[in-house]
Structure formats: C-alpha cells, structure tokens
C-alpha cells in the first residue's frame, strides 16, 4: 500500500501454476432434482521458495442441492463445503460447511417464500477475529469464510399480470 488510504494492485512478479478439475452432475427423477459439484484446485506460487499454495484458494470445494419442484411448490436444501485455505502469512484456516433451505409456494398472483441461509451459523468470527487493532486504527485480516453467519429471509415474488405458464416439465404436472 502507498498510504493508509491508497493501495496498488499488481500482477504476480512471476508465474503461478494452476491445475484442477471440476465436475457437475445433475440427477432428475419426477419432481426431484439433485445437483452435485466438486472442484479440486491446486494453485501454486512458482516464484516463492517451496512453491506454496496460493492464499485464499481452497484445494477442495463441494456442493449439493436437492430440489423438489412442481406447479405448486419449490423446496430446496443445499450443502456447501469449503476446504482448508492458507492465508498470506502461511497460516492454515479451518474448513467449513454451510447449509441452506428454501420453501416457496406458487400462486397465480405470486410466490411467498421463506429462506434460511447458513443456518449452521458458520462464520469467520467463530474461528478468528475479523477486525484487529484499535477503533482509530483498525486492521482487517483476510476474509476466508462467511462474515454474515445465519441469514433468514421472508419475501414475496409478486406477478402483477398473473402467473405465466412455464414450459419446463416441472410445472406441467
């Protein structure tokens, strides 16, 4: 950084090697859909002695969403896993899992819903401080996990002109 209020971002001085693989799978049975994904990421800083892993890049990420949907309802349950990461100082973080649930009822006029995100309340503040230093001179460590924790929302998607017929087979039953 140039000063406490100005920063310069620049490219890495030499090569970064990134290898990996990602897979996404979808299973469907009647009104059920199950999505699974996994990513393996091996990104190394070739210009640093020992070729350490790139900071804030988890080697393993996975997710799963199970969705039930028909013309009247949409219900979804999700699980996401983020593997351990390294911070810029070489410290290894905790891995974590987040869970979510969505329930939505469809009507001609719209769709009320209730949504629970990260209902296991996984957040960085449970593992390490999010702010260091003093009130007048705060220091913000790297962010590697959710900062919000549990989020609960209730809402309505309003369709002022009525519900449009969907051509998707999940709504035709």
Question: Where are these predicted regions, by residue range?
Answer:
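C-terminal beta-signal and adjacent terminal beta-strands/loops
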Residues: 105-173
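Strand-loop-strand
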Residues: 95-96, 108
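Short, well-ordered turn and helix-capping elements at secondary-structure junctions
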Residues: 81-85, 100, 107
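Gram-negative outer-membrane beta-barrel transporters
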Residues: 3-87, 157-159, 166, 170
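Aromatic-acidic/polar surface patches that form glycan- and anion
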Residues: 14, 55, 92, 145-146
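Surface-exposed extracellular loop regions of Gram-negative outer-membrane beta-barrel proteins
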Residues: 1-12, 78-90, 121-139, 143
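Short, basic/aromatic-rich helical patch in the C-terminal catalytic core of site-specific tyrosine
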Residues: 23, 101-103
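Transmembrane beta-barrel architecture of outer membranes
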Residues: 18, 59-63, 96-100, 149-151
